[in-house]
């Protein structure tokens, strides 16, 4: 290895790396700020303009886009015609390229960033050099990740060159890196144009964790996160205690966070298998947790609990009495953390809560991808319609609105029975609506008397209303829209139940 081209925005570790290369007899070629850093550190360096015999121009936009650079990168060492061609133009082969790119992601995440600032942080020369070097990985070693410095240096020190396998691995990483970089730029500019569903989409994710296994032990899995921090998301969670999250933990935690984010008042959400098993609302977080626990004392065991306020010592004492997989909250008091951390198998996570979740959700299907807006519509309750003779009382309306927030997060067909403070029965995932209703009503038992019922979609028949009435339900909220709405309304009137139509459906598959 005779010649290395180094141009980096992240200068961590680059000076000692270059010093080792010089000790191995490698000539260093560099640009701009990287060259200045080498000169300041006393590392011998050749400026890029000495190689190209052309000055940097356009405020640094054009530095390395030159045949003297790309010829030295792309020439096949095993092809005589290539080597003769670059020799004829006094172009020397470049054997090692170390480049990382302008910080586009960090730039667009800055508050108040302008379009001009974003544009100026779109790297052109860097990706071009990386791609040229990666294409010719048979001869050229290319490094885009500072984490690879030590491994490359070790091979050079021990063997005088890198192995083919190493170069191939590094080239693959480069193409992943440049593809992700371009995808981020494309997404940023597409969002500016307001185009929701462009003809092509490319998403970039960063691997956060290789998981022990997936949904089942025979399935391999990993967890990838979107670039940047998305508040009130599991990808933004910080783990304070416990072993690594599993695939199922992550999915359940995501479901719990989505429900907890619906509420501004203190709420506790218990989830099992991506469905809520208990949701409690209170004047404080202790009361909210106790309501969630009372909602289903059996199912909460081994569950995931998300709370939207700091966990205090009293709440932690209650939680410590049962086995919980995960507790997620904005924060834990010192006393609460000390209490819960005594339990070896519990995982404690903090997540920044910032209101409702917006954006888009993606679902894979064989051979494709479905993309839709998150079900985060802020509904205009003034458009809700009371269609029965009986009007809901203020307390009933408060309970209806609370359960309406919850039912949209339950797998369809979804029925939730509850009060303004807690769920009392949840029927999820049945293939017919009456089936889900009967499950929810049976779970609620005697507590259904005086409670309300929420349905994620319309009633195809009046049987759910009749079952609710016979269990003591006093008010129902549902979207409406069935050809048999009149029959359901008539059944409600027959039993003196109030019914509110929202005209918004909340299927969840």
Curated annotation (Swiss-Prot):
InterPro entries: AICAR_Tfase_dup_dom_sf, Cytidine_deaminase-like, MGS-like_dom, MGS-like_dom_sf, PurH-like. It catalyses: (6R)-10-formyltetrahydrofolate + 5-amino-1-(5-phospho-beta-D-ribosyl)imidazole-4-carboxamide = 5-formamido-1-(5-phospho-D-ribosyl)imidazole-4-carboxamide + (6S)-5,6,7,8-tetrahydrofolate; IMP + H2O = 5-formamido-1-(5-phospho-D-ribosyl)imidazole-4-carboxamide. GO terms for molecular function: IMP cyclohydrolase activity; phosphoribosylaminoimidazolecarboxamide formyltransferase activity. Residues 1-144 form the MGS-like domain. Its EC number is 2.1.2.3, 3.5.4.10. The keyword Hydrolase applies. Keywords: Hydrolase, Multifunctional enzyme, Purine biosynthesis, Transferase. GO terms for cellular component: cytosol. Pathway: Purine metabolism; IMP biosynthesis via de novo pathway; 5-formamido-1-(5-phospho-D-ribosyl)imidazole-4-carboxamide from 5-amino-1-(5-phospho-D-ribosyl)imidazole-4-carboxamide (10-formyl THF route): step 1/1; Purine metabolism; IMP biosynthesis via de novo pathway; IMP from 5-formamido-1-(5-phospho-D-ribosyl)imidazole-4-carboxamide: step 1/1. PROSITE patterns: MGS (PS51855). GO terms for biological process: 'de novo' IMP biosynthetic process. The IMP cyclohydrolase activity resides in the N-terminal region. Belongs to the PurH family. This is Bifunctional purine biosynthesis protein PurH. The gene is purH.
